[in-house]
Amino acid sequence: MTITEKILARESGARLISPGDNIWVNAGMLLTHDVCGPGTIGIFHREFGKDAKVFDTEKIVILPDHYIYTADEKAHRNVDTLRAFAKEQKLPYFYDPGTASYCGVCHVALPELGHVRPGETIFGTDSHTCTHGALGAFSTGI
């Protein structure tokens, strides 16, 4: 098996997988930012209920990095939505712009902060999420 197949097999509990197989995998880490995060949060609440809780607070990283330094108040609403969700869910990995915890572009910051580990699965709401495959993870945008 390829490294991708090995990672996906392990994360799905299968001994062996092949191209074309349909599998369910355990997510090692989920990423979102200020572009897709608010919509994702809306879907989360719509599908699971207003009082729903995330499955594992340690596996969710929210890092706004697209519209953070702009005069557009609508763009600021996106970060406000992320901030409120992180507080509501008690997410430890919300990197808030303008605070000491902020760390820049998500795809650079994730490995620097230890959120990317070889052999894990990473799903992010950004097409560049796949760059973390260079560090030995299975990583893709959704």
What is the predicted function of each stretch?
Residues 1-142:
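Fe-S-dependent hydro-lyases/dehydratases of central metabolism
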